[in-house]
């Protein structure tokens, strides 16, 4: 919305005197900062009202796993879920205000985010109303996620330039590109769905998921800005993708809304993100990675999410094949709880790991 002030200053005679001042809205960096501040303020202001309403409507709050750590049955009982609504509301408001409304990449990523958010919301709704940890049928949920992801990947392919639109870029090497053809649809959908569910699995302790999400969003905001700038892309020898720089504004909005949410989600949490938030934010990260052609780098920057997802896969596979469990409990953050680590220890140490992985992922921009 604010982006249109530039055009108004050119077309409305009375606003021409403000043109030098309004010119700042041309800059993605300025609008990214504005989106970040707006997202944070929105969640700070409306967060208490949203939490009170969710607590009133949900009654007993999110059901706690009976087979999980016993401390959770006491410390987390009665805490409302669906806190992702706070983040998504801040994200949408900030994006509408600060992003270029004519940029198709913005709307594709936003569509994936809200689509996954709706799936997560329905999953949370079933869990709360039925007071069971089992929500949406797994296959149905996965099918809906795949449909959204496939539609987004198809739109991204149509936006890109051939044959690069279906290419997989290999980091660390200059100009090493593998054209996947239409198989890129399946690959891109796998990245988006995988990211959504990996973040979902990570969201098991107070503050554990939101900070790594913010770190990843900040990292991909930088990558999107650089990939969407012809000068920087040429200097760093990364592929230039016109228009993707605008995705930095979305990342700024997530960073701000995430900071606001963390205020209420810090231990002991007043609200949980729920599948509403974790699925949506993971899907957003996956779709941005596909849009800017840094899918492999997402596995590095989001390595913590990968670790959480792999721990579940390994645990399930091992138990089905051998009848034995590799970890005391999965996802892996619960394994460390069973080893005696306190919740703050696990959360802060995982944050540190996320920072280190983000730095490693960003370093690939220069290692060519």
Swiss-Prot record:
Its cofactor is Mg(2+). It is an enzyme of class 2 (transferase). The keyword Cell membrane applies. GO terms for molecular function: metal ion binding; phospho-N-acetylmuramoyl-pentapeptide-transferase activity; UDP-N-acetylmuramoyl-L-alanyl-D-glutamyl-meso-2,6-diaminopimelyl-D-alanyl-D-alanine:undecaprenyl-phosphate transferase activity. It comes from the Bacteria. Its EC number is 2.7.8.13. This is Phospho-N-acetylmuramoyl-pentapeptide-transferase. Pathway: Cell wall biogenesis; peptidoglycan biosynthesis. The gene is mraY. It is found in: Cell inner membrane.
């Amino acid at each position: 919305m604010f982006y249109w002030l530039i055009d108004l200053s050119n077309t409305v005679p009375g606003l021409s005197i403000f043109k030098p001042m309004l010119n700042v809205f041309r800059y993605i960096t300025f609008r990214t900062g504005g989106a970040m501040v707006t997202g944070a303020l929105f969640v700070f202001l409306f967060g208490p009202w949203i939490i009170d309403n969710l607590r009133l409507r949900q009654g007993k709050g999110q059901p706690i796993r009976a087979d999980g750590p016993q401390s959770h049955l006491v410390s987390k009982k009665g805490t409302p879920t669906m806190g992702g609504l706070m983040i998504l509301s801040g994200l949408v408001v900030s994006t509408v205000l600060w992003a270029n409304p004519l940029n198709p990449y913005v709307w594709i990523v936003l569509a994936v985010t809200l689509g996954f958010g709706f799936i997560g919301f329905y999953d949370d709704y079933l869990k709360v109303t039925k007071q069971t940890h089992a929500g949406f049928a797994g296959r149905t949920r996965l099918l809906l996620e795949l449909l959204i992801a496939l539609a987004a990947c198809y739109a991204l392919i149509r936006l890109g330039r051939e044959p690069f639109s279906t290419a997989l870029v290999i980091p660390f090497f200059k100009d090493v590109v593998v054209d996947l053809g239409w198989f890129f649809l399946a690959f891109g959908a796998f990245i988006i769905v995988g990211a959504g569910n990996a973040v979902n699995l990570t969201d098991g302790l107070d503050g554990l998921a939101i900070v790594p999400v913010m770190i990843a969003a900040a990292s991909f905001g930088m990558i999107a800005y650089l990939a969407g700038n012809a000068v920087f892309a040429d200097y760093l020898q990364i592929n230039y993708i016109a228009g993707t720089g605008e995705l930095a504004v979305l990342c700024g909005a997530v960073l701000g809304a995430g900071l606001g949410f963390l205020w209420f989600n810090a231990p002991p949490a007043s609200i949980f993100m729920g599948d509403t938030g974790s699925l949506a934010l993971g899907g957003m990260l996956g779709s941005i990675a596909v849009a800017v052609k840094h899918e492999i780098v997402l596995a590095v920057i989001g390595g913590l999410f990968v670790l959480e997802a792999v721990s579940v896969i390994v645990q399930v596979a091992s138990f089905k094949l051998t009848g034995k469990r590799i970890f005391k409990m999965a996802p892996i953050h619960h394994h460390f709880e069973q080893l005696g680590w306190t919740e703050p220890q696990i959360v802060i140490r995982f944050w540190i790991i996320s920072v280190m992985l983000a730095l490693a992922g960003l370093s690939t921009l220069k290692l060519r």
